[in-house]
Amino acid sequence: MALSLYRPDLEVNNTAQTRLTSQYDNLDQLSSAFKVKHTTQSYQAQFASLYYLRLAKLKKLTQNRSIEKWNEIPGQSQKPKFYSRVLDVDQNQLSYVVGTVYMDMKLKPNVLDDLARNKEAEANGIKHWVAAPQPTEKIYSDNDELCLEDESGRIKLVGPIIANTQLVTGIIIGVLGIEKDPGEFTVLDVCYPGVPPQPSKSASMDSDKSPLVAIVSGLRLGSQVANDALARRMFIDFISGRQGGSADQGLSSRITRLVIAGNCMSPPVAHVDDKKPKRFGQDQASFTSLPSTDFDNFLVELSSYVEIDILPGPDDPAGTLLPQQPFPKAMFKRAHDNFEQGSIVCHTNPTWFSIDETRLLVSSGQTIDDCFKYVRGDSRLGLAVDSLKWRHIAPTAPDTLWCYPFTDKDPFILNECPHIFVNGNQSQFETELVEGPEGQQARVVNLPQFTETSTIAIVNLDTLECQPVTFTTSDGASKADGDDKENDKSGAKVEDDGEDLIPDDDSAGEL
């Protein structure tokens, strides 16, 4: 189904439609865990404490689920025995144990290897530092070893079952199996902490008039690419309801909030004047302020139509450690009053908040990007879905994903299941409705960068149905599949994913 923002056959309705409003809650009881106070910041602690906190929090839960699952196995005369420590497992005994997954990966960057290369270079008379290897999208290889560890030690996991299970370093699991050879545990089954409980929410009786939330990532304001600017202009006109007929405006009037999930601004580019004489050690590169200025202007314009939630991303001017802290309001001179009025909210990355009792967990994508390095497959959506049953959204932190060295909590543990789970800045649009064993329903959305695909997502807050909206231009028609090649004017395409959020042209304009 296509939604054209520029349709000459459709009379534009200049009568402004009243935008729906929603109840908003920043969920301090959940989101505050991601906030690092400047007064208590300390980087003196070791990262190992984070693993112990994670294991202490999830071990008992996983143990209870393992006992429930394996206490008695149909058709098995031998009753499995539970061991509380991995090094206590007896040989040739059907047993199960709970611990933290650790993947010993040959391709994983290692600072000790870097130091060894530098020492070797110095021994060979090389006086400069050896360059570090280039980062790769994958660090997985067939020679990797999978281990399970706890406070007692580590045991190697082997067998076809575990080899074909998608795991990453840092998750807590229970494994059923037999230690046939010393130090090697042949896995027969795996148990996870499971999807956490989910708060109930009321649903609207008329889903065609339910409020919607629009989600975008990778806007990269300040980019000088002409097609990016045109797509953003179309996006603004769509959200504000200034484009199209009554059906299009009816859709935009149901959007109660806009979520910007990271990479809001274009990365700065250094400019050095090559013509002026060089004074080594004193030359300074100059940077343009265009990205922050453009983002400021963008927020001022859109916040007059819809309330906005902002998360920093990996390429934004924010700290590199997770959780990234909110943008300072001082960055936005023109939009400052909008922050004070509450129409714009700056969040940590990741963050929690709710709209009309629908709870959203939003990340700018670093967590999925890092987990993706560990697995053989290419499904980023599968990793996002697995995060729910792992009850953890950043298991590879702090091993390969930089994070703050928390000493009293692991904020990335999921104590409850969100209704909408968003990961921004992914390679493509993907979505799935996950249903848990206790009636949980979570809409998982992986969203690509807007500058790459000109795509946003719209989610119905009542039904959790989701559709991508792709804005295309005649110069960038390759950005969206299924473009109307007979129409030379700019348009937008809505890809169907289960629910028609956009009515046909012969409808009355209500959705």
Task: Put a short name on every predicted segment.
Residues M1-L511:
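Extended recognition/assembly regions associated with phosphoester-bond processing machinery
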